[in-house]
């Protein structure tokens, strides 16, 4: 007997494999966790009670790690954060051996962040439990794209026909890639803008409109998403100086006037104030949804953990 599941994927490794209706299903699932997080005196559910969630972050993180930890704990999971700095990885253990070790411990969920593109897929191929990609190199960051989509839908009520401008360091941003894929699947028109040194070659193949002038890119835009300069991934020479970058590509109050009157300003964090975005814009609650993105992140990750666990139980025939 074959099972028909609303979300038939064993892992969540990227947005690219998902159909639009599957993305919308995850957004709908997240809505009930938004309600729980906002309304409940005790923010706790037993959906993952008795299950073990391991967060293995091979790359530094604050928001994403905390968000996944809170999400797992609110669902009742036993959450373990793997201290990579003190692990056998630092002693030369291969990624595959690490994956086999984690699998032998019978973890029920693995949340992985890694600096190498494709590393999370490599781990997923070696383990029995669901794997969630918390960001791999310059490849994808699916839960960030999902929480961004959730934020946009809650503010705008739709995706079809929206003009979304993604601005900044597109070259090194896995967030940009996942957001582009998700938003286009959902019917939005995506523009990208940045200096030519920070725009990946052939990105037009993803269906985006490319700009090198911020004013033109955000003109009439419904959503403006700013990205930080990922200097930790740069060898140098990508921009002349932070001052010049801000002058050309920093979002100011004056530049924001070029966008739609009800423009939504977003940023995945962390912010570099005075570089890609001015404080006056980031802190303006009329336009800025940056804090709301953080809130939606917990609910969205709760939904992903819950959905993948339910899918596994259905396939395994567990009660």
UniProtKB/Swiss-Prot annotation:
Enzyme category, top tier: transferase
GO cellular component, one term: cytosol
GO molecular function: amino acid binding; aspartate carbamoyltransferase activity
Pathway(s) served: Pyrimidine metabolism; UMP biosynthesis via de novo pathway; (S)-dihydroorotate from bicarbonate: step 2/3
PROSITE patterns: CARBAMOYLTRANSFERASE
InterPro entries attached to this UniProt entry: Asp/Orn_carbamoyltranf_P-bd, Asp/Orn_carbamoylTrfase, Asp/Orn_carbamoylTrfase_sf, Asp_carbamoyltransf, Asp_carbamoyltransf_Asp/Orn-bd
Pfam families: OTCace, OTCace_N
Family listed: Belongs to the aspartate/ornithine carbamoyltransferase superfamily. ATCase family.
PANTHER family: ASPARTATE CARBAMOYLTRANSFERASE, ORNITHINE CARBAMOYLTRANSFERASE, MITOCHONDRIAL
Protein name: Aspartate carbamoyltransferase catalytic subunit
């Amino acid at each position: 007997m074959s099972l028909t599941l609303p979300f038939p994927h064993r892992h969540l490794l990227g947005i690219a494999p998902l159909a639009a209706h599957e993305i919308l299903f995850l957004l709908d699932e997240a809505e009930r966790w938004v309600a729980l997080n906002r309304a409940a005196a005790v923010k706790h559910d037993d959906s993952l009670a008795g299950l073990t969630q391991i967060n293995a972050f091979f790359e530094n993180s604050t928001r994403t790690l905390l968000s996944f930890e809170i999400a797992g704990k609110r669902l009742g999971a036993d959450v373990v954060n793997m201290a990579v700095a003190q692990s056998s990885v630092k002693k030369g253990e291969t990624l595959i051996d690490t994956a086999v070790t984690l699998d032998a411990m019978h973890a029920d969920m693995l949340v992985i962040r890694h600096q190498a593109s494709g590393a999370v897929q490599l781990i997923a191929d070696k383990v029995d439990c669901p794997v969630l990609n918390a960001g791999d190199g310059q490849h994808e960051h699916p839960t960030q794209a999902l929480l961004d989509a959730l934020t946009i839908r809650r503010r705008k009520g739709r995706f079809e026909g929206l003009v979304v401008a993604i601005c900044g360091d597109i070259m090194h941003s896995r967030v940009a890639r996942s957001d582009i894929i998700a938003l286009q699947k959902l019917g939005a028109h995506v523009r990208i803008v940045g200096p030519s040194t920070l725009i990946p070659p052939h990105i037009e193949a993803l269906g985006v409109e490319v700009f090198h002038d911020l004013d033109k890119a955000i003109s009439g835009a419904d959503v403006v998403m700013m990205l930080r300069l990922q200097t930790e991934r740069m060898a140098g020479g990508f921009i002349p100086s932070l001052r010049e970058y801000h002058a050309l590509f920093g979002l100011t109050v004056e530049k924001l006037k070029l966008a739609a009157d009800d423009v939504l300003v977003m940023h995945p964090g962390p912010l570099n104030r005075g570089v890609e975005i001015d404080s006056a814009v980031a802190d303006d609650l009329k336009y800025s949804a940056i804090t709301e993105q953080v809130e939606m992140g917990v609910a969205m990750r709760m939904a992903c953990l819950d959905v993948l666990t339910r899918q596994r139980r259905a396939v395994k025939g567990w009660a």
